[in-house]
Structure formats: structure tokens, C-alpha cells
Amino acid sequence: MTPTGPSHHSMAPKRVLPAASQSNMYGNIRSASTTSTTASTSSQALRLLQNAKTSKNADNRIAHAERQGPPSAHPAAMQKPAARVAPSNENRPDPAARQHQHQQQLQQQKATGHDRVLKESQAGNSTTTTMTSTQSKEANKWSLANFDIGRPLGKGKFGNVYLAREKKSKFIVALKVLFKSQLQKAKVEHQLRREIEIQSHLRHDHILRLYGYFYDDTRVYLILEYAARGELYKEMQAQKAGHFDEDRSAVYIYQLAKALLYCHEKKVIHRDIKPENLLLDLKGDLKIADFGWSVHAPSSRRATLCGTLDYLPPEMIEGKTHDEKVDLWSLGVLCYEFLVGKPPFESQGNTETYRKITKVEFTFPKHVSEGARDLICKLLKHNPSHRLSLEGVIAHAWIQEKISQRS
């Protein structure tokens, strides 16, 4: 695929994801209950893989799923979880043994290291791809034949996501299948190329790994780390109060600040931090999952309007250039949404939202503590240079208090 030209971002309605975020169909994966244990989450994942061996090949399984209907062009379709169909009992292993086996698999993947397992399965060939002149050579190291394909886990505008297992190593992954025709129609090939280029080079505990990619005549396949507990946004919605408590919010902000600090050290600006782009792994730890709007900008300030309306900083709305400090603003908005259940500048119309953002006009509900208010106010500064640094976020008294209580 080749880029078709520069990005042209049109402002989306509230809570409607931009094109890059719509491709984050993997974010629909989540456990049946927000209180699921490690064992039940493991068992669920293995059940999704149950019928992989009954297909003649992986392509037939994907083709069958695609025949159920084309991916919806409406972003709301992404919020609908895949239907659960009970697997056949034929040749079904004992549930307790299956659960134990899968739990061991996920733990072994973590202990052994993601890269090592997949690299060994390719007999020494590197699986980490780079967007260089060797793109085709790298991509050809993988094919659909390398994977057992499980059930579809999510559907979005550009394709589907499947739970999958690399045949040789038994390594469990999420396989994002994107339709070239849809990418070309939306003119977002360049965003996909950018996402692959950036995410494949990042190695951090709180950033979802992109192990590699490959493609055929009609589809592009991304081999992604499997985050068993799914999308953080849905986890938040499932809370009785509609938002997280302060202990949990502080832990997530701490983990995200560490990941963003790593990104900024690598000269990567995310530009689209929001709950929908964050996943939870088997242990409940946060993972940044979508880099479609990210840029690698070592020495320049960007002027592109991107991201989600509620999370846009004043400098973007005002048409000014921006740098990595846009992520600091988004972190403040996210912290507020974690604690309140909605973004601080949410309004009935876009014009009013714009006005509130440029005036930094918002209020706190009574239940938000002084410590949390202090952190949010230090991040939501109109002048980017006045925003609290990521090091300051990590060292903030409210964050440290909650982190120490957790440990």
C-alpha cells in the first residue's frame, strides 16, 4: 500500500471515533464480567479458539466470518461485542485441564518474552517489521497458514479482529484483519503505515505490542499482543457508578504517564489518548493500543488537527502548532473522565465544546478529592508550557499516595 496524500481530518461528532480509532476493532475484546478472575479470563480465551482445528484452513474461517456481512461503516457498530456461540463438545478437552493449560500459556508468554517465542517459531527469522525498503521481504515472513484462527472478537469499519494462535509456538495473539478496499476508500493507508512503523518499534509494559504484519491481495493482517480483559472504556462503563474510584484511576494514570514518558523519549507523540484507545491485560494493567494518529516528530512542531473532540487541546482548536504537550492535556481530560464518567468539556454541541476548551471552563463534582483536582488542574492549562510534566505526574502526591496503598 502507498499513501494517497496528506491527512485531511474532518471534525467528528461527540464520542464518534476518528478514522484511525475506528480501525481499533481489537478494543472490543473484553471479559464477560469486570470482576473476572485470571482463570475465567483464560478459560474464555481458550473457548474462543476451540473450533480452530475444525476449519480446513485459516482463510476459510476468516472468509466464513466475512460472509456474515460486510464490516459496518458506522462507528457505533464497534461497540457491539461479538456473539458468543457455544463450541462443539466433540473432542473437547476437560474444562479444568483446558483452563489450567491456557493460564500456563499466557503466563509463560509473559515470562519467556514476546519476541523470543515468536522469533524461535520462525526458525531465527525476525518477526519485528519495519517500514523500510525491505517491507515486502519482512511481511512475507508470515502468512495466514502460520496461525490457527479462533472466533471473531470484534468488527469495525475497516475489518475484523480474531483470537489466534501461532501454530508452532502455540503463542496466543490477536489478529487484526483490515480490508485494503476499505482503507483505500477512506484514504487512510498512510495512517496504517504510520501505525505499523511506530508501534513495531515500541517496547514497554504499558504499550500493546505489534509483533509483525503480512498481507495478501485483499487484506492486511496485524499480529497484536492479546489483552485479555479488553477495552478500558467498556470496563469503566460497567462500573456501578459509571466511573472508576480514585485508587484505580490513579493507578491507570500512573501507568499511562510511564508509557507516554517512554514514547516522548522516543520522540513519539500519541495525540489521541482516550479510554477507547486503552486496553487491559490479563492482570488488569493498562495498555496503549492505537497509534493511528501518532507521529514521530524529533525536531518539528505539528499543525495537523487530529484526535477526538472532547480531548483536543486549545492549541489544536486554535490552529496553532503543537508538540508532545498535547498528550499532557489529554492525560488531564482522561483523569477527569476516569473519576467522573464523562469528559470535562462535554457539551450539547461542538461549538460549545470548543468554547469551553479554549476557555478551560469546567467544574468538579463534590466526590472528586482535592488531590485529584490539583493534578487535573495542573494538566489542563491553556498554555502548553505551563502543564505539569510527565515526571511531575508520576511524582504527584495524589498519585504516589494511591500507588503506595496498592503496593
Swiss-Prot record:
Region described as Disordered: 1-43, 66-137
Domain Protein kinase: 147-399
Regulation: Cdc2 activity is required for activation.
Gene this protein is translated from: aur
GO molecular function: ATP binding; protein serine kinase activity; protein serine/threonine kinase activity
Gene3D superfamilies tied to this protein: Phosphorylase Kinase, domain 1 (3.30.200.20), Transferase(Phosphotransferase) domain 1 (1.10.510.10)
Name of the protein described by the UniProt record: Aurora kinase
Active site: residue positions: 272
InterPro entries documented for this protein: Aur-like (IPR030616), Kinase-like_dom_sf (IPR011009), Prot_kinase_dom (IPR000719), Protein_kinase_ATP_BS (IPR017441), Ser/Thr_kinase_AS (IPR008271)
Catalytic activity: L-seryl-[protein] + ATP = O-phospho-L-seryl-[protein] + ADP + H(+); L-threonyl-[protein] + ATP = O-phospho-L-threonyl-[protein] + ADP + H(+)
Function: Serine/threonine protein kinase that contributes to the regulation of cell cycle progression. Involved in meiotic apparatus formation and polar body extrusion. Contributes to Plk1 activation and phosphorylation of histone H3 at 'Ser-10' during meiosis I. Required for accurate progression of early embryonic M phase. Involved in chromosome alignment and cleavage furrow formation during early embryonic cycles. May be involved in mitotic spindle formation and cytokinesis.
Top-level class of the enzyme under EC nomenclature: transferase
A Pfam family assignment: Pkinase
Location(s), subcellular: Cytoplasm, Cytoskeleton, Spindle; Midbody; Cytoplasm, Cytoskeleton, Microtubule organizing center, Centrosome; Nucleus
UniProt superkingdom: Eukaryota
Record keywords, A-Z: ATP-binding, Cell cycle, Cell division, Centromere, Chromosome, Cytoplasm, Cytoskeleton, Developmental protein, Kinase, Meiosis, Mitosis, Nucleotide-binding, Nucleus, Serine/threonine-protein kinase, Transferase
Biased composition (Low complexity): 31-43, 126-136
Binding site for ATP: 157, 176, 224-227, 290
Native source organism of the sequence: Patiria pectinifera (Starfish)
One GO cellular component term: nucleus
Family listed: Belongs to the protein kinase superfamily. Ser/Thr protein kinase family.
